UniProtKB/Swiss-Prot annotation:
PROSITE patterns: FAD_PCMH (PS51387). Pfam families: FAD_binding_4 (PF01565), MurB_C (PF02873). SUPFAM superfamilies: FAD-binding/transporter-associated domain-like, Uridine diphospho-N-Acetylenolpyruvylglucosamine reductase, MurB, C-terminal domain. Residues 26-191 form the FAD-binding PCMH-type domain. Belongs to the MurB family. Its EC number is 1.3.1.98. Cell wall formation. One of its GO terms (cellular component) is cytosol. It comes from the Bacteria. It comes from Chlamydia abortus (strain DSM 27085 / S26/3). It catalyses: UDP-N-acetyl-alpha-D-muramate + NADP(+) = UDP-N-acetyl-3-O-(1-carboxyvinyl)-alpha-D-glucosamine + NADPH + H(+). This is UDP-N-acetylenolpyruvoylglucosamine reductase. The active site is at R170, C218 (proton donor), E287. The gene is murB.
Length: 296
């Protein structure tokens, strides 16, 4: 079904919602239809309906790794607002995907649980962390995942174990399908030093990354054995700007919105960086999720 087709939804939706309000980049035009779901049953109903009508849609969480188009999105944006957590054993916790990943890491480390200290300061949701296999250095989400619950195209809830999740460096199976991540179960351990570890990681992030300006975090994946930020800096592009988009003077793997950046300016800046590095024999892949106005 075309996104322009007038459709009657059997649930409440909002129309022409500006996506810049749902992106940490503060960029993006209006979505045709927009809905925040707060429960599994609500998500099941929406997903089943959209799939059965072959209606184009995307799933977003806190929008911390999304670059929306200036024109918006010609389709349905399903925003995940399902939050909550529960311990299923002394050191195993099930967390719903709309929960803040950073807040989860802070809460657990403050309570003496280790495993997710690295999450403190990562601005996305638990679902986003699973989707991207978020991490820092040699620590990532995959290392502490026990299982993930999803909602499939039929509205059914399925569970995947770690081996079925296709985890790799900043990647997972979910980047190649449109399954709705419902929850993740994490394996933790007890560690009295966890709160100090989390604080040290957060301090280093605040010192090295431009948290005061809108961005989506790292724009590029690190090439094997190297640092994208270091390579961009060495190429002389640190601080380079195009319109309202700028390669951060603080961390060269961040593009920041200095006030009125457009998605087109950000994409052009990404291309400039890629072309410059390619001339040196280095291919940089985007880590940011670039969402087109219309799905292919």
């Amino acid at each position: 079904m075309k996104a322009s087709t007038v459709i009657r939804f059997p649930f409440s939706v909002r129309r022409s919602v500006w996506l810049n309000k749902y992106s940490t980049f503060r960029i993006g035009g209006p979505a045709n239809y927009f809905k925040v779901v707060h429960s599994a049953s609500e998500a099941q109903q929406v997903i089943q309906f959209l799939h059965s009508h072959n209606y184009p849609f995307i799933i977003v969480g806190k929008g911390s790794n999304c670059l929306f188009d200036d024109r918006g999105f010609d389709g349905f944006v399903l925003c995940n607002g399902i939050q909550g957590k529960e311990f299923v054993s002394e050191t195993t916790i099930k967390v719903y995907s709309g929960t803040s990943f950073s807040f989860l890491g802070k809460t657990l480390s403050s309570s003496g649980y280790s495993g997710l200290e690295f999450a403190v300061g990562i601005p996305g949701s638990v679902g986003g962390a699973v989707f991207m296999n978020a991490g820092i250095g040699n620590q990532d989400t995959a290392a502490v995942i026990e299982s993930v619950e999803v909602i499939n195209s039929k509205g059914e809830i399925l569970s995947y174990n770690t081996e079925e999740l296709g985890f790799g460096y900043r990647t997972s199976r979910f980047q190649h399908c449109n399954e709705f991540i419902l929850s993740a179960t994490f394996r933790l351990s007890r560690n009295s030093s966890s709160v100090k570890i989390a604080k040290d990681l957060l301090r280093n992030r605040l010192l090295s990354q431009p948290y005061q300006q809108p961005s989506t975090g790292c724009i590029f994946r690190n090439p094997p054995g190297n640092s994208a930020g270091k390579l961009i800096d060495e190429a002389g592009l640190k601080g380079f700007s195009l319109g309202g988009a700028q390669i951060s003077p603080k961390h060269a793997n961040f593009i920041v919105n200095t006030g009125r950046a457009t998605s087109q300016e950000v994409k052009q800046l990404i291309q400039i960086v890629q072309d410059k590095l390619k001339s040196q024999g280095i291919n940089l892949e985007e880590e940011v999720r670039i969402i087109p106005y219309q799905l292919p």
